[in-house]
Swiss-Prot record:
Gene Ontology cellular component list: extracellular region
Keyword entries, A-Z: Disulfide bond, Ion channel impairing toxin, Neurotoxin, Secreted, Signal, Toxin
Disulfide bonds: none
Post-translational modification: Contains 4 disulfide bonds.
N-terminal signal peptide: 1-19
Role: Probable neurotoxin with unknown target. Possibly targets ion channels.
Tissue: Expressed by the venom duct.
Location in the cell: Secreted
Species per Swiss-Prot/TrEMBL record: Californiconus californicus
Protein name: Conotoxin Cal8.1
Residue ranges listed under propeptide: 20-38
Swiss-Prot/TrEMBL domain comment: The cysteine framework is C-C-C-C-C-C-C-C-C.
Main localisation: secreted
Length: 131
């Protein structure tokens, strides 16, 4: 398993998909067709709802800090947009590419994977925050 990020609150192993979670809370689904073939979904803040940021550390497989990434989310609370803790609605926009929506695991490491451009799965599991 590849460990990607750590955050600030959390709970047990769970799985969700973008199609299930996008559009909850203050997020709305956005569908984009790439090269007339591939379809990519991500979430964006609804009009009038402020986007907020949080900086988190990305860890390697040995729980050592690699770097920091900035996550953006909608609304006042980080849990907005995801209906089950420990997830928080976020989109990773630091690459400069189109934002990718996921619900991240607070205070626990998580693994993000996707089977195709329409179905995203995110799995949370318990772990320590890297220093």
């Amino acid at each position: 398993m590849k460990l990607l990020l750590t955050l600030l609150l959390g709970s047990a192993l769970m799985c969700i998909t973008l199609a299930d979670e996008c559009g909850l809370g203050t997020h709305r689904p956005v569908k984009e067709v790439i090269d007339n073939v591939r379809t990519m979904y991500y979430c964006d803040c609804r009009a009038g709802d402020a986007e907020r940021s949080i900086t988190v550390s990305r860890c390697d497989d040995n729980n050592q800090k690699q770097d920091d990434v900035i996550l953006t989310y909608c609304g006042l609370e980080q849990t907005t947009g995801c209906n089950t803790n420990p997830y928080t609605a976020a989109k990773h926009d630091s690459s400069g590419d189109k934002p990718q929506f996921y619900c991240s695991c607070l205070n626990y490491k998580y693994e993000q994977s996707h089977s195709d451009y329409r179905h995203w799965t995110i799995r949370c599991y318990m772990g320590n925050i890297c220093d």
